[in-house]
Amino acid sequence: MVRSVWKGPFVEGSLLKKADAARASGRHDVIKIWSRRSTILPQFVGLTFGVYNGQKHVPVAVNEEMVGHKFGEFSPTRTFHGHAGDKKAKK
């Protein structure tokens, strides 16, 4: 389901503070975040976030096409190893 328009996008408060501090300092360090549910805002464009996927922080460089999406969409939590092959065909 889509969030209702009158509520506006959800962004973690600490995430806004970290992004503002990074913009003010002008440094291009990776900002570590755990909030996969936060929406990417236009003010995040050009910053790099380390989005936690349960094991490590996956670096996500935000560009204009990502605005409006969630951080979790760009940090997969599961690894696909492929379907099991046919055992009879190998012999």
Swiss-Prot record:
InterPro entries: Ribosomal_uS19, Ribosomal_uS19_bac-type, Ribosomal_uS19_CS, Ribosomal_uS19_SF. Pfam families: Ribosomal_S19. Keywords: Ribonucleoprotein, Ribosomal protein, RNA-binding, rRNA-binding. GO terms for molecular function: rRNA binding; structural constituent of ribosome. One of its GO terms (cellular component) is cytoplasm. It comes from the Bacteria. The keyword Cytoplasm does not apply. SUPFAM superfamilies: Ribosomal protein S19. The keyword rRNA-binding applies. One of its GO terms (biological process) is ribosomal small subunit assembly. Belongs to the universal ribosomal protein uS19 family. NCBIfam families: rpsS_bact. Protein S19 forms a complex with S13 that binds strongly to the 16S ribosomal RNA. This is Small ribosomal subunit protein uS19. It comes from Afipia carboxidovorans (strain ATCC 49405 / DSM 1227 / KCTC 32145 / OM5) (Oligotropha carboxidovorans). The gene is rpsS.
